[in-house]
């Protein structure tokens, strides 16, 4: 469960390493985001020479959460960390690689490019 001021690891090679959540998109007064939700973030740590610079305001989609998500069959999927992938306005990732596993719920929310780039879909 991601909320305002939450820090997330960046799971792509866009140049950002850590982002801080500014706003959860999707309705007025919405407080929390889960896997597959789009958030507005600012870059807190970045690698030198990357596409994304420190202090830049970006949009990202949450791909892993510690809280996890409940599936229709009653099972839960949880991860060891909170992670996001920085995206463009057309929902495609800014980077060219995705690191670590992503949840199957991204496929239902039309983030097909992220799912296809991910090394593992759980």
UniProtKB/Swiss-Prot annotation:
Keyword Transit peptide: no
Gene Ontology terms for molecular function: large ribosomal subunit rRNA binding; structural constituent of ribosome
Pfam families in the cross-refs: Ribosomal_L14
A single cellular component GO annotation: cytosolic large ribosomal subunit
GO annotation, biological process: translation
Record-linked SUPFAM superfamilies: Ribosomal protein L14 (SSF50193)
Keyword terms of this UniProt record: Ribonucleoprotein, Ribosomal protein, RNA-binding, rRNA-binding
Alphabetized InterPro entries for the sequence: Ribosomal_uL14, Ribosomal_uL14_bac-type, Ribosomal_uL14_CS, Ribosomal_uL14_sf
Segments crossing the lipid bilayer: none
Subunit structure: Part of the 50S ribosomal subunit. Forms a cluster with proteins L3 and L19. In the 70S ribosome, L14 and L19 interact and together make contacts with the 16S rRNA in bridges B5 and B8.
Family: Belongs to the universal ribosomal protein uL14 family.
Role: Binds to 23S rRNA. Forms part of two intersubunit bridges in the 70S ribosome.
Name of this protein: Large ribosomal subunit protein uL14
Species annotation: Exiguobacterium sibiricum (strain DSM 17290 / CCUG 55495 / CIP 109462 / JCM 13490 / 255-15)
């Amino acid at each position: 469960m991601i909320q305002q001021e939450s820090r997330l690891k960046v799971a792509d090679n866009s140049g950002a390493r850590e982002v801080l959540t500014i706003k959860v998109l999707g309705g007025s007064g919405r407080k929390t985001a889960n896997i597959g939700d789009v958030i507005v973030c600012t870059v807190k740590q970045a690698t030198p020479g990357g596409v994304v610079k420190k202090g830049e305001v970006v949009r990202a989609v949450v791909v892993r959460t510690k809280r996890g998500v409940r599936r229709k069959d009653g099972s839960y999927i949880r991860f060891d960390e909170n992670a996001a992938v920085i995206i463009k306005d057309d929902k495609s990732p800014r980077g060219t690689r995705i690191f670590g596993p992503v949840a199957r719920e991204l496929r239902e929310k039309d983030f097909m490019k992220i799912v296809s780039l991910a090394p593992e879909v759980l």
